[in-house]
Each structure stands twice: as C-alpha cells, then as structure tokens.
Amino acid sequence: MKLRIAVISAILSASVTAYSQEPGPVISESSTLTIEQCRDLALNNNKNLRRGALEVRAAGYQKDEAFAAYLPAIDFAGGYMYNQKKISMFDSDQLLPIKTFDLEKQGYEFNIVKNPMTGEPITVNGQPVPEQVAYLPKDALSYDLHNVFFGAVTLTQPIFMGGKIVAMNKITGYAEELAKSKLDNSARDVVYAVDAAYWQVVSLRAKQALAQSYVNLLDTLSNHVALMIKEGVATRSDQLTVDVKLNSARIDLTKVDNGLVLSRMALAQLCGLPIDTQFTLADEGAENINAPAVRGDSPIDMQDVYDRRYDLRQLELGVKIFEQKANVARSEMMPNLALVGAYSFSNPNIFDGFKKKFNGQFSVGAMLSIPLWHWGGNYNKYRAAKAQTEAMRMELENARELIDLQVRQASYKSEEALRTRRMTEVNLAKADENLHSADVGFSNGVMTLDNVMEAQTAWLKAHSEDIDARIDVYLCDVYLSKVLGTLDFTTPSLRR
C-alpha cells in the first residue's frame, strides 16, 4: 500500500543523515529498547538536527549583528606614505617689497626709487622699483615630507536610514524563528522515521515467527505424508507436493530473516548506533500489541492544526520576511541622514609648520544622502519585492489547502486501518478454526492433502494480514499525529 511505501522511503532518507555524535546509552547484546529510547537516541545523534542547531545559533548572531546598526560605528584608519621630494612653496628665492610709515599720509607706503631729476618713479619692465626689499629664501618655505604618518578615528551614528535598520532587525528576528521552526520540524520528521523503522522491525520479527511456524507445519505434514506412503495411503506425488511447499516456505523464511537484519541496521543507523549493534525491541514477540487509543469523533479544528504545523509556520514567517524586504527596497528611495565625527592627526602636522610630531583636530558634521533619479531602478526593485510577497502569500494559502487534504486523508487512513484490524481479527479466528478442522479431518481420512495445504495457506495469509493490520494501525496513528502537529516527543538540548 502507498502508506507503507512512504514509510520505507522515510526510513531510507532519514537513515542516510543519522550518525552518532554524542555518547548515548551503552547498548549491549541483551539491551531491550523501547520506542521512546529509540526516539531519544535518534534525536541526540541526528546530523540534520545538529546542523539545524548551528543554523539557529547563526541566526541569533545575525540578529545581534542587525541590532548593532542602531548603535554608532567607531573606526580607525591610519597609514604611512613615503614622498620622493620635498614640498616647496616657491620655485626660487623671493624678494618682497616692504612698506614704511609716511607721516604726511599717516599710513604705510611702499618706498619707490624715484628719478632725482624729475621725481617720477623709475620702472623696470613697467613695474616700479622698491627702495628696500625683504629677502625670503626658497629653503625657508620648503618642508621635509619624505615620511608622513597619518590616521583618523571616525564615528558614524545613523539618524534616519529610511526604515532599513528597523526592517533588517525584523527580518533577522523572523529568520531566527524560522531556523527554530525548521529544527522542530526536522525533529518531528526524525521521530516519525524512527517510529516507522521501529514498527517495521516489529512487523518483520512477527512475520519471521509466522514463517517459522508455517515451515514447522509443512515439516510436520511432510513427516505425516511419509508415514502414509509407508502405509500405502499416500503417493509419492503427495510427498513431492508437500516438499515443494516446504522448500518455498523456507525460501520465504530466509527472505524474512534478511529483511529483518536490514531493518535492524536501518533502525540502528537512525538511532546513531553502529549498524551491527545487536539489540531487541520492547514490542518484539508481543502476542497482543495494544492498539493506540481511538480518537474521538469530534471535528478537527483546522486553525489549531495550522498553529501546530511547523512547516506552515515557516511559510508564515517567509511572508513576513518578504514584507520587510519590500520595506528595505523602499528605504533605498528615501533620504539617509547620519551624524559623523572624527579626530584626524598626522606627522608632520599642518598645525605647527609641518613639524615632525603628531598633532590633530576634532571635526563634527552631518551627512545627508538623497536619491534623486535612478531611471526607475529602485522603484522596480520595490515592486519586485511586493510581487514576491504576494507570491509567498499564495504559496501559504495553497499550503493550507494541502494540509486540509492531508489531514482528511490521514484521518480516513487511520479509520480504515482500524476497520481492517477488526476484520483481520475475525479472519484470524476463522483461519485457525479452519486449519484445526482440516488437520482433524486429514487425520481421520475425511480430508485430502490439498484441503490441508489450502487451510495452511489460508492460515498463513490470515496471520500475515493480521500482522500488517496491527502495524498499519500504529503507522497510521503516528502519521495522523504528525499531520495534526500533535506528535509528542521530548526535544533534546540542541540549541546550546
């Protein structure tokens, strides 16, 4: 049936990712594991859960990183530069005209060389010639800047970033919730896979005992036929018919033995144990496994189911994240304002005539950035984010519809499994009675060998169907608990 195929797929996919990372309980050859112990082993040793715990931790760090954007950023930058040449303010020595105080004019005037005959200023190349000059050598304004050290300590405090910082903090908060939800959902998947593997082993162990009983029946029948041949009331053909059935039953028993070994290996791997670990399960060999409690006929509150489903919670968080991404895109169309401050210094410094010592100054200001025109790029980015948000909402609605269908299917399968279990119990009693009647009739000579083998085949089929029905009740109940979000288990400390 489809459910059993899904169960086997879950076992195989989950067993690939399970391995032992923490020392668990010591498992000896005489150890008996309950289903709760198998769950605990798997939850403590599953690789996917370990990875999910690290993702939760990383999401927490990213949330702290986003919060830091509210606070001022303090940075230091420094450097060294070698210059090949000195810096000079003049290309040569300079002669600067000077002024003297004129008593008549009550002010400073340039002393100009005048012609003693005419009293007119003497000019050279059209420029008057001063009587006195100040000599300013080139070296006086040349500075040794071969080795320059510089640095600055800066502070940047965001004041208004268009809502980007607020949106990023919400995104990282939702991302942390999303990582936790994924971890819980993965734990639920692991528990479901372990339960499926557990009951698979129990089922095969019961079928192994059934196959052995069937072999014993045929072996006993073969011995009876051999005695009847000696007495002349049976033929060689009857003996061969029984022997063929016996060999076929032994082949089936071998297949069941191999399947049981492989199923134990799959369960051991899920539990994080070496695959060759020898252990028994608490429900192995139980004559009557108590069926799970029958659920009431009260209607299922789908809103409660939605609230308990981690996968649906992930989609809801995805919608919120995309909403905030749209806000981030919108912030790029809004002005950004930040307060900036700095202390800069250098050696040689410009405050003391380029002396070779450190000196610096403080500076404070504000920086405003206003996007003016980007040819619609930012606006299209915002519209794309809004479209992605709507697409995520549609995916969320579709998921709710699929969950409705999934819950109904699981409920029907659970009810079907219970009805099948009741019918197999009736068939089992009839098959046992039929086999007993056939054995008695064959011993009294009123039943043929074919009648006995038909009764044995019907007995085998009835017992096999009963085993499948009992296990299906558990598998369907676990699956229904999973889709309802009520699969109970104790989550280990994975988020440390």
Identify the residue ranges that each predicted region occupies.
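Residues on the lipid-exposed face of transmembrane beta-strands in outer-membrane beta-barrel proteins
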Residues: 80, 153-157, 267, 343, ...
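Amphipathic alpha-helical coiled-coil scaffold segments and their short linker/junction regions
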Residues: 39-43, 95-138, 273-340, 489-496
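Hydrophobic, lipid-facing positions within transmembrane beta-strands of outer-membrane proteins
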Residues: 149-155, 301, 362-368, 410
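Small/polar (Gly/Ser/Thr/Ala-rich) solvent-exposed segments
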Residues: 50, 74-88, 138-146, 156-185, ...
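Periplasmic alpha-helical coiled-coil/stalk elements that build and connect Gram-negative outer-membrane
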Residues: 61, 181-304, 413, 417, ...
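Acidic, low-complexity, intrinsically disordered peripheral segments
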Residues: 4, 19-27, 75, 82-109, ...
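Bacterial Sec-pathway N-terminal export signals of envelope proteins
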Residues: 20-88, 275, 281-320, 371-372, ...
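Amphipathic alpha-helical coiled-coil segments
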Residues: 51-66, 186, 192-209, 227, ...
